[in-house]
Amino acid sequence: MTDKKAQPEKSICTCNDTAETLASVGDVIDKFLHRVLDVEECAKSFIDDARKNYNENADRLRLEASKCIDIIRNEEDSDQKLYGIRQLRRCEREIDRHNNSSPVTTLEKSLFISLFASFDSFIGDLISVLYQTKAELYKNISKEIPLSEVLTFSSIDELRQHMLCEEIESLRRKSYYDQFKDLENRFSITLTQFENWPSFIECSQRRNLYTHCDGIVSKQYLTICNKVGYAFQEEPKIGDELKIGGKYFFQACHIISVVAVMLGQTLWRKILPAKIEQADTHLSRVIFDFLHMEQWQRSISISKFVLGLPKISTDEMERIFHVNYAIALKAIGKSKAAINVLDRKDWSATSNDFKLAYAVLNEEYKKAKSIMEKIGGQGDLISEIAYHDWPLFRDFRYQQEFFDGYESVYGYKYCVKLSSIVEEKKAEVESTENDDAQ
């Protein structure tokens, strides 16, 4: 389920390499989440291709080498033998290059490092937007600056921006462990007491190994991982080489995404408590978007964080969070856990929209059909497009009760409207393609 988006005011962040308009902490989080999704898409698109090309090249070289050897052994013509020898030497050089190449590993390392480069940018954007939204925070910057340098600035605003950029760069030079501790002290809040904190720090330390040591385990890596309580399946030794692999890579993407959401939201709520409704709306949309992408574990992790928050803006929003959490749990086969989440709240006095959600998730499809008819064409939250689009109805859309209820409410079959929507979207795509071609 989702709610209407808030429309925050604009502010300018200029501490990164390029100036860019960022409306709120929500925009900062969204920008980072899209970068992580970009990295994941690159991994899915190019790593398999690199592995396939590597193996195909190996097969080609083996075949060429075999042909050259046959020519040398069997050909009586001296010119042909000489040609075979030259070709074999060329092939041997290609084989040597092939055997010393590692395109898959190179791509994995590059994309993994890119994750944390984006996180560095996220930290800068986050601090910048918070300071620019709440100007009193500038008073906490205690850096000294010579008068001669002060006089080079044309305005107080320019000076403040310079000081903020210096503060952000100083923070970025620290390890992530020290960055989080700095932010805890700066804003008087706990930021490291969450389940994936040790895993996040291990990932960040592994990034350092790939950046500086080609993945070779160092004493510092082991010391810091043990300091935060990271549980190794089998603790490596100094000098061992750490691999990445698909499972670890995508788990790192999951962890860093969730950490960014939690960090951004926690500071947003602490520093700008009056914006809690805006923060909740953003969180609801993030979870809703991950549900649409069928990123169930990401939805679950963020939902756990949300329902552990000390305050949620409205009862309606809290119920939306419960419903979306249950949707994700049900999608991974944890139907009983999903109902347990819903049963934390009393739904008897709620709107029909929420009663429909409960019935659907509890697979009470006859009851759900009846509630659909009570809601009619437009509910408090549910509209016609919701039946086509919302993850809540993902399984219900295959049930006869859904088809009957939909036709009863709207006067035409679900598949007729679905075909109409498909044609509209097709026309939109074609229109966009035509505009791009002009």
Regions found by a protein language model. Give the residues of each.
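Alpha-helical repeat scaffolds
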Residues: 297-306, 334-346, 366-377, 400-410
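Residue-level signature for tetratricopeptide repeat
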Residues: 289, 328, 358-361, 395
